[in-house]
Design a protein with these regions (language model features):
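Structural motif
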Residues: 37, 58, 139, 162-164, ...
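Conserved beta-strand hairpin/beta-sheet module of binuclear metal-dependent hydrolase folds
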Residues: 1-52, 152-169
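Cap/insert and terminal regions of metallo-dependent hydrolase folds
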Residues: 171-261
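Active-site metal-binding motif and surrounding structural segment of the metallo-beta-lactamase
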Residues: 44-91, 186-187
């Protein structure tokens, strides 16, 4: 199982120039599972070639915020006419409602559940429920409840060789840690840390982690996966990374970057 990081930033922009060369662009949350499953649909999706976009059959959306869905309308528009079957968008009922009301509403973007025809759409919805897993080609995706400002999910993704957990945007909660600590074959734990410690009040309001709280939450972990961190705000990326090292360095966190790959084999 191959989990490719298409985007994992908390915003846009690029890293500083080095030796006169442009820095790497930051891309928002989007991850490619093997070749056919997309986990979130942020701006990282835009870097995939068209033939790779065409292979994506399933999109799992953690929640309705723009940085996790913004590439979905354009992706569907790009490949819909050249596919033989619709792309299935898996999400909470509340997230599906938000997509219908605010994105695919014929005002912001066409409704691809009606194009080119009701009987032959480019997109179909599949509602998710927490702890109700879906198996696709030997990979099982189990939705995990998240604690965010809108209804949200994380995902436990597993195959015969092992598994990973992607928290999505969340303040981890008791149910989250019960799930994580019950996974014997957990290879990777992907958590977000969006803000610096000086912005802790904003982090709490926005329901994102800051480094001190990340360290506090990690003390609840009873398994030993590789810890991966995402969603750092580009404007404070270096400061957030330093604070993560200072407060959670004993857990050997890895700050993920666009282009990284997590293999489970």
């Amino acid at each position: 199982m191959r989990f490719q990081i298409l985007g994992c930033s908390g915003g846009l922009g690029g890293s500083p120039r080095t030796a006169g060369q442009p820095g790497k662009p930051f891309r928002t949350s989007s991850f490619l599972l093997d070749q056919d499953i997309l986990i979130d649909a942020g701006t990282g999706v835009e870097d995939l070639p068209v033939d790779e976009l065409r292979r994506i059959d399933h999109v799992f959306i953690s929640h309705s915020h723009l940085d996790h869905i913004c590439a979905l309308p354009l992706m569907l528009d790009t490949v819909g006419s050249s596919r033989e079957r619709p792309v299935t968008v898996h999400a909470l009922p509340e997230t599906i409602h938000a997509l219908k009301e605010h994105i695919f509403n014929w005002v912001i973007w066409p409704d691809f559940t009606e194009i080119p025809h009701f009987d032959h759409p480019w997109m179909v919805y599949s509602p998710l429920q927490v702890d109700n897993p879906i198996t696709i080609g030997g990979r099982t995706i189990r939705p995990i409840g998240a604690n965010h400002t809108v209804p949200a999910l994380g995902f436990h993704i597993s195959c015969e060789q092992g598994s990973l957990v992607y928290s999505g945007d969340t303040l981890p909660n008791d149910a989250f840690w019960r799930t994580v600590n019950g996974i014997a074959d957990l290879r990777y734990l992907i958590l977000e840390t969006a803000f610096t410690n000086r912005e802790r009040d904003l982090a709490v309001t926005a329901k994102h982690l800051h480094p001190i709280q990340l360290a506090e939450e990690l003390n609840r972990m009873r398994v030993d996966p590789q810890l991966c961190i995402t969603h750092l705000k580009p404007s404070d990326r270096e400061q957030i990374a330093r604070e993560i090292e200072a407060w959670a360095g004993r857990f050997q966190p890895r700050i993920l970057q666009t282009g990284d790959v997590l293999d489970i084999d």
